[in-house]
Amino acid sequence: KTAFYSGATPLAAGAIIGGGNDEQIEALRAFGLHTGLAFQIQDDLLNLVGTKEAANKDFRTDITEGKRTLVAVHALSDERYHDEVEAILSSGTDNPAQLARAVEIFQETGSIDYAHTYALDLTAKAKAAIENVELDPHARELFLSMADFFVERLN
């Protein structure tokens, strides 16, 4: 839902207010939706594998809060670790060892890589959405740069 109200809707509204045609409005809506989702996935990754300093007070709180992020759902789909991940997510723990164990499982199951690849795919879809639509060249370049920034924040 965040991608819809923070990305898709504002860009579509801006296109409407700016006098955009239906093709431009839809392209910017799609761009906003895809980049908004990519941004959220990357934000979830930063919460897990960034540094405590970079994530500030929210480091690994998604685990403590039991959030079913894309990373967590992917890890839960692995039968080898399902019960352990479910137990950690359901516990409300803020124990650093337990949080580290969850991240270790997320890495072992390929869930972190899966989520990052998914975010990159969403970014590619976002860029494709505006590729053949008439836009101001400076605006297009800004949109493309923003899309890249959203998924490169971890690097």
Language-model features, listed with the residues they occupy:
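All-alpha prenyltransferase/terpene-synthase fold signal
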Residues: 1-155
